[in-house]
């Protein structure tokens, strides 16, 4: 036998240990059934005692020599007298939880939340007593207290204290109606009819429910109505358990596959009679639980959202209440321990049928898919297993199956969709502690991993993202989640947005929020101009950072903020020339008037339309931004629904190391985006493959956000202030005029001051914009912007409106006539 392998047949000691465990579980199960029968008997005796109650029977409150007429004798007379004295007629409905508890013990073997349900039982009994006391006492009532007993009268004295007397008539009826709902809720909760969605499964009973009787146990857990059928199911459960245990102990069930405890379960491969192949070895496989929901951060626990100071007031961040709250759903029975074990064995058998030898070593269930980790036998090529993705999906009766090598491990991941898909909500991601306490400067909530863990990415480190996917794959929803992730963390002073939407549908809803630098660009020609402006802004930022002597935008903002805090201007010493007499260099101190620079995120929703209009210009601008804009704080999120080589060119791919692929139609499109196949096997609706820097691919399930949620957030942001648009972003420039010299300024050569020339141009042409002054005077953008700001300060032109236009306030010669 080859070293390192062992037979797949179980050892004798393991079988004995397993049989002992099953026998112990069987005994424990019978104890619970006996306890349930005992409790049911006591409940029936209590009902019989109350049904035959007679006030004349001897008891603690009546010392008489009359014969006992109660069906249970003197103990029944004492019990019924005490119950009627304290609770009155409410003693009868108060016995309902006890009857349900007895059935639960016999069927399920445990009662969840017993402490809380006991308190709810007491509360229900008291409320039922108060309701009974609200009714008028008939003349035939033999007791001097109300129908609700002592406790009912005591509770009604509370409203009587405020009403000035014991409630009667219509007031008593109203009080009874008010108390009816909480009384029923307490009664149902105490009985276990409601409030069972979050109960934990009793681990002691798991092993007892793992045989041929699993179907009965599942039916009992799902269908809780009908006590008679459940009792029959419990007896059938007992018979099957006893038969199965006897067969195992006598050796008849040795060839049946056994399941150990869930955390240390053993995956046994089906033996394949292959020539020169050693028998498969049995290894312990670890089945992981789904990661718990992300823990909410401090922001989700505060009632009011934090406020950030702004120059013209207070900017209030959007509230998490604008987003839909995650719904509580019960765990899918298909993801139970037994079901995962069975699927793992079935998958191992399918692989052996196709000639792939190996074993399942790990199982990771998630909200959308389940990952089965396969450790192949020596000599098995990973490409062979990857090529079987369609055959595996067919054999496992799944919609699709994705097979990929797990980086850094000797394992191949096989991802199969769950029968029931769970929804991932954006509110759950933004309220999580991982997102709020993330140190990322521009954090994006991408979604959850296969195991249910949140994925928070930093676009400042990416530094650009390429998103691709077909229509309906969830690409537009992912763009919205990225935008909302920025809006929930960044103020307009910290991050500004440029949105380019040639489709005129997806991003137009954000038009008017204060984070925008320009209205949403829908014209492809203006989109080219906006990208060129972004390139010029990047170059201008680099010049500013060079003057200050820093290497990135964070260092620049820190340096400028520190100078503003101290009240000291930033100055530098520059050489202006040489002294004519001595020849020594002349140095002057230049004061720099600088402000902190916000991050700029350029969002392009459809790249294919732009490439059709101006492919070379778009590709050149995107290439320069992708190569150089990271240190300047400018980042690009580019999306397309046509992932072909004419849209995603080699130049663009080389400069976008971070890529996200949603469902595509073919393997060729998947290779175009990610460099490998697999995206064609995605499930759609936010299911994505996230490739971070370095080529490591991770499957992520994106969160969902509805249009109504986006509209509520946008309306809130619009109330915080108007956007400060820059008209130069979308105004086309005539490079030919600007390169040769000032255009149209022949009559202004007598003035050496550019400001005077600019004022004359504005008054003559009645046009006031930064780009217009820049073209007419042949000066740089920064200088033209300073001139326009000076004109606004001196009252020559007004502030820019929502479209970026300015009104000329100084009357011209034409206005006099």
Swiss-Prot record:
PROSITE patterns: FTSK. The chain crosses the membrane at residues 31-51, 87-107, 118-138, 145-165, 174-194, 226-246. It is a multi-pass membrane protein. One of its GO terms (molecular function) is ATP binding. Residues 247-817 are cytoplasmic. InterPro entries: AAA+_ATPase, FtsK/SpoIIIE/SftA, FtsK_4TM, FtsK_alpha, FtsK_dom, Ftsk_gamma, P-loop_NTPase, WH-like_DNA-bd_sf. Keywords: ATP-binding, Cell cycle, Cell division, Cell inner membrane, Cell membrane, Chromosome partition, DNA-binding, Membrane, Nucleotide-binding, Transmembrane, Transmembrane helix. GO terms for cellular component: plasma membrane. It is found in: Cell inner membrane. Residues 252-304, 731-753 are annotated as: Disordered. Residues 264-273 have a biased composition (Basic and acidic residues). PANTHER family: DNA TRANSLOCASE FTSK, SPORULATION PROTEIN RELATED. Homohexamer. Forms a ring that surrounds DNA. This is DNA translocase FtsK. The gene is ftsK.
């Amino acid at each position: 036998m080859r070293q390192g392998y062992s037979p797949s047949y179980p050892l004798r000691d393991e079988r004995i240990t397993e049989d002992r465990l099953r026998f112990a579980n069987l005994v424990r199960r019978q104890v619970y059934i006996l306890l349930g029968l005992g409790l049911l008997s006591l409940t029936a005796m209590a009902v019989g005692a109350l049904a035959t109650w007679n006030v004349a029977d001897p008891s603690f409150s009546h010392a008489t020599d009359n014969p006992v007429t109660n069906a249970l004798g003197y103990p029944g007379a004492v019990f019924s007298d005490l119950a009627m004295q304290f609770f009155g007629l409410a003693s009868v409905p108060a016995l309902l939880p006890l009857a349900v508890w007895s059935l639960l013990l016999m069927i399920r073997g445990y009662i969840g939340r017993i402490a809380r349900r006991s308190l709810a039982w007491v509360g229900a009994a008291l409320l039922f007593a108060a309701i009974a006391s609200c009714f008028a006492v008939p003349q035939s009532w033999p007791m001097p207290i109300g129908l609700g007993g002592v406790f009912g009268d005591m509770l009604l004295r509370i409203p009587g204290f405020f009403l000035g007397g014991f409630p009667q008539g219509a007031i008593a009826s109203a009080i009874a109606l008010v108390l009816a709902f909480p009384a029923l809720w307490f009664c149902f909760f105490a009985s276990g009819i409601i409030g069972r969605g979050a109960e934990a499964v009793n681990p002691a009973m798991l092993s007892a429910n793992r045989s041929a009787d699993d179907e009965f146990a599942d039916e009992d857990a799902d269908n809780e109505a009908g006590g008679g059928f459940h009792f029959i199911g419990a007896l059938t459960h007992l018979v099957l358990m006893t038969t199965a245990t006897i067969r195992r102990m006598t050796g008849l069930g040795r060839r049946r596959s056994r399941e150990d405890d869930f955390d240390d379960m053993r995956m046994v491969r089906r033996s394949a009679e292959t020539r020169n192949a050693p028998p498969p070895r049995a290894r312990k496989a670890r089945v992981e639980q789904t990661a718990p929901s992300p823990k909410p951060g401090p922001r989700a626990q505060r009632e009011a959202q934090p406020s950030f100071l702004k120059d013209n007031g207070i900017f209030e961040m959007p509230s998490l209440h604008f987003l839909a709250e995650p719904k509580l759903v019960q765990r899918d029975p298909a993801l139970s321990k037994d079901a995962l074990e069975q699927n793992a064995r079935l998958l191992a058998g399918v692989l052996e049928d196709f000639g792939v030898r190996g074993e399942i070593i790990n199982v990771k269930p998630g909200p959308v898919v389940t990952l089965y980790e396969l450790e192949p036998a020596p000599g098995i090529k990973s490409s062979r297993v990857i090529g079987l993705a369609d055959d595996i999906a067919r054999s496992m009766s799944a919609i699709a199956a994705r097979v990929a090598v797990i980086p850094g491990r000797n394992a191949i991941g096989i991802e199969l969709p769950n029968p029931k898909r769970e929804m991932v909500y954006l509110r759950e991601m933004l309220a999580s502690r991982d997102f709020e306490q993330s140190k990322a400067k521009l954090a994006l909530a991408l979604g959850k991993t296969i195991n249910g863990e949140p994925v928070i990415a930093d676009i400042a480190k990416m530094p650009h993202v390429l998103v691709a996917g077909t229509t309906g794959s969830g690409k537009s929803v992912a763009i919205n989640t990225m935008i909302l992730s920025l809006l929930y963390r960044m103020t307009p002073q910290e991050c500004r947005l440029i949105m380019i939407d040639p489709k005129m549908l997806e991003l137009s809803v954000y038009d008017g929020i204060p984070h925008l630098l320009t209205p949403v660009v829908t014209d492809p020609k203006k989109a080219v101009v906006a990208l060129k402006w972004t390139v010029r802004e990047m170059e201008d930022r680099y010049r500013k950072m060079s003057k200050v002597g820093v290497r990135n935008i964070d260092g620049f903002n820190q340096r400028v903020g520190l100078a503003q805090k101290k009240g000291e201007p930033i100055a530098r010493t520059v050489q202006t020339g040489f002294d004519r007499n001595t020849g020594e260099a002349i140095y002057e101190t230049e004061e720099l008037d600088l402000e902190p620079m916000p991050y700029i995120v350029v969002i392009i929703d459809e790249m294919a339309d732009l490439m059709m209009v101006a492919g070379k210009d778009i590709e050149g601008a995107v290439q320069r931004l992708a190569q150089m804009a990271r240190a300047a704080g400018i980042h690009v999120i580019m999306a397309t629904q046509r992932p072909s080589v004419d849209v995603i060119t080699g130049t663009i791919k080389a400069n976008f190391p971070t890529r996200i692929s949603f469902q595509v139609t073919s393997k060729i499109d998947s290779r175009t985006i990610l460099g490998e196949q697999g995206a064609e096997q995605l499930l759609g609706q936010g299911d994505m493959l996230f490739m971070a820097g370095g080529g490591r691919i991770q499957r992520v399930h994106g969160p969902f956000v509805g249009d109504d949620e986006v509209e509520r957030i946008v309306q809130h942001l619009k109330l915080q202030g108007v956007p400060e648009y820059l008209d130069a972003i979308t105004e086309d420039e005539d490079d030919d005029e600007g390169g040769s010299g000032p255009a149209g300024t022949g009559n202004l050569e007598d003035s050496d001051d550019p400001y005077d020339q600019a004022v004359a141009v504005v008054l003559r042409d009645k046009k006031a914009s930064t780009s217009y002054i820049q073209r007419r005077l042949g000066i740089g953008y920064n200088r033209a912007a300073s001139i326009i700001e000076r004109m606004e300060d001196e009252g020559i032109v007004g502030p820019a409106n929502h479209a970026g236009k300015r009104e000329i306030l100084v009357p011209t010669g034409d206005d006099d006539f």
